[in-house]
């Protein structure tokens, strides 16, 4: 599924024709370029490598500089590979923009969640904790982590305290509310992983054929694009 590299700007709200307010996330998409093309004949599958946001050449090692020169591009900070059905419509150095998406389309977005540091089980796993009564001293403790003789150890994947957040998360079947081509901005319904100015990857949804996703798509009737342009 073809996709783009973007930057999360933040959240706002827009109004549907019936007056319902819906939350949307604004994603800024700088010009994306095709850096490398993989085909089923040479690599076993079809895919394109997309890059975005230029950086100084001195920040890259020579093999990477040569990698970009093959596509006649300056070195780019972010790279992402997207699977495609057919590579014949792409060329090295080709520029990709927000116009590959259209309002009402379903997309998947991948980003890194906000890092929370080392947290306990109540914040990390939403544990209920112990009673808040007087005389109790285990209010926010973990509690039991296993049996005694059998198995005599802590099971793998046991929910315990640890580093919270900063994980790669995919949010599926978000509806594209509007595409502002002149500003390079995509508005999607709902929240997107990560903090403001965080890098996200947008691609056409893998579950668009499911009935639940289709109902979500049909539920929204969007306001005219010219009204959205006044708010962004």
From Swiss-Prot:
Source organism per UniProt: Hydrogenobaculum sp. (strain Y04AAS1)
Cited InterPro entries: Ribosomal_uL3, Ribosomal_uL3_bac/org-type, Ribosomal_uL3_CS, Transl_B-barrel_sf
GO biological process, alphabetically ordered: translation
Subunit-structure text: Part of the 50S ribosomal subunit. Forms a cluster with proteins L14 and L19.
Signal peptide per UniProt: none
Domain of life: Bacteria
One Gene Ontology CC term in the entry: cytosolic large ribosomal subunit
Identification of the protein by name: Large ribosomal subunit protein uL3
Gene Ontology MF annotations: rRNA binding; structural constituent of ribosome
Gene: rplC
PROSITE patterns, sorted: RIBOSOMAL_L3
């Amino acid at each position: 599924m073809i996709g783009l590299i973007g930057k999360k700007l933040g959240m706002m709200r827009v109004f549907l024709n019936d007056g319902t307010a819906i939350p949307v996330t604004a994603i800024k998409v700088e010009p994306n370029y095709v850096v490398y093309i993989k085909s089923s004949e040479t690599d076993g599958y079809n895919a394109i490598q997309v890059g975005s946001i230029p950086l100084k050449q001195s920040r890259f090692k020579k093999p990477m500089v040569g990698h970009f020169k093959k596509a006649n591009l300056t070195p780019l900070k972010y790279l992402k590979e997207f699977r495609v059905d057919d590579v014949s419509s792409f060329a090295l150095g080709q520029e990709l923009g927000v116009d590959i998406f259209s309002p009402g389309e379903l997309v998947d977005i991948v980003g890194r969640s906000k890092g929370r540091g080392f947290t306990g089980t109540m914040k990390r796993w939403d544990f209920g904790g112990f009673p808040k009564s007087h005389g109790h001293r285990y209010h926010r403790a973990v509690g039991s982590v296993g049996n005694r003789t059998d198995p005599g150890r802590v099971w793998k994947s046991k929910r315990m305290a640890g580093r919270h957040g900063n994980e790669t998360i995919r949010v599926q079947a978000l509806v594209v509310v509007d595409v502002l081509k002149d500003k390079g901005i995509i508005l999607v319904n709902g929240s997107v992983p990560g903090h403001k100015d965080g890098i996200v990857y947008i691609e056409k949804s893998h579950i668009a054929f499911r009935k639940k996703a289709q109902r979500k798509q049909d539920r929204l009737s969007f306001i005219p694009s010219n009204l959205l342009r006044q708010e962004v």
